[in-house]
């Protein structure tokens, strides 16, 4: 697989990382906020929540479970992308640059797509095809999971300590559960 460092920007879509074949048989998409970066509930509360402050993401702690899972994906050369929605009122450019720096520090060599649009539409646009059952999204937010499954793909709810396992049928909170979910819907990590 040939890879090239690149920037890709189209409409409200920004990609940074290494380009590889978009015709992959399947793809794993991983959310950032509340999945690879720990979610702190208090940071989202109040009139002037902390998450709206400049460079907030730089202070987020990495989730060791997802870091370990990404290292497995890298070891087995399983295609994955981080897919992060950056919504107003956040400063789009500042937020995306902070997240790129954060990924470079904690999981170098990772690819990321930022969008202000639907994660499904963004993934389909990037892949150049409709989502299919083997395309997996690991996210912590039910509306993203619902939209993903409604598009015919597989959604895994990552339990981060702030969300409920009772509101989704396919969940994972540790490396073993993530591997089991992946093995059930993708190829296999042994």
Range-by-range predicted roles:
Residues 7-26:
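Short, Lys/Arg-enriched N-terminal segments with co-localized hydrophobic residues
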Residues 136-171:
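Acidic, Mg2+-coordinating phosphoryl-transfer loop and its flanking beta/alpha structural elements
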Residues 66-96, 103:
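Substrate-recognition element of Asp-dependent hydrolases with the DxDx(T/V) motif
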Residues 59-63, 78-90, 111-114, 156:
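Short, well-structured secondary-structure segments
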Residues 25-60:
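Active-site neighborhood of HAD-like aspartate-dependent phosphohydrolases
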Residues 161-190:
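Charged phosphate-binding loop/patch that engages nucleotide di/tri-phosphates or the phosphate backbone
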Residues 115-148:
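Conserved Lys-Pro-Asp/Glu-containing loop-to-beta segment of HAD-superfamily phosphomonoesterases
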């Amino acid at each position: 697989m040939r890879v090239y460092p690149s920037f890709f920007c189209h409409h409200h879509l920004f990609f940074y990382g290494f380009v590889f074949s978009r015709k992959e048989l399947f793809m794993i998409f991983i959310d950032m906020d509340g999945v690879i970066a720990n979610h702190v509930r208090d940071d989202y509360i109040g009139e002037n929540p902390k998450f709206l402050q400049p460079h907030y993401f730089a202070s987020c702690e990495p989730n060791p479970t997802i870091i370990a899972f990404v290292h497995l994906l890298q070891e087995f050369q399983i295609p994955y992308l981080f897919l992060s929605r950056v919504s107003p009122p956040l400063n789009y450019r500042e937020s995306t640059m902070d997240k790129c720096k954060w990924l470079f520090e904690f999981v170098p060599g990772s690819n990321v797509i930022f969008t202000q649009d639907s994660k499904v539409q963004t993934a389909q646009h990037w892949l150049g095809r409709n989502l299919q059952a083997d395309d997996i999204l690991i996210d912590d937010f039910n509306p993203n999971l619902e939209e993903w499954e409604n598009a015919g793909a597989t959604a895994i709810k990552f339990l981060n300590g702030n969300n409920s396992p009772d509101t989704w049928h396919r969940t994972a909170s540790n490396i073993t559960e993530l591997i089991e979910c992946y093995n059930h819907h993708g190829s296999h990590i042994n």
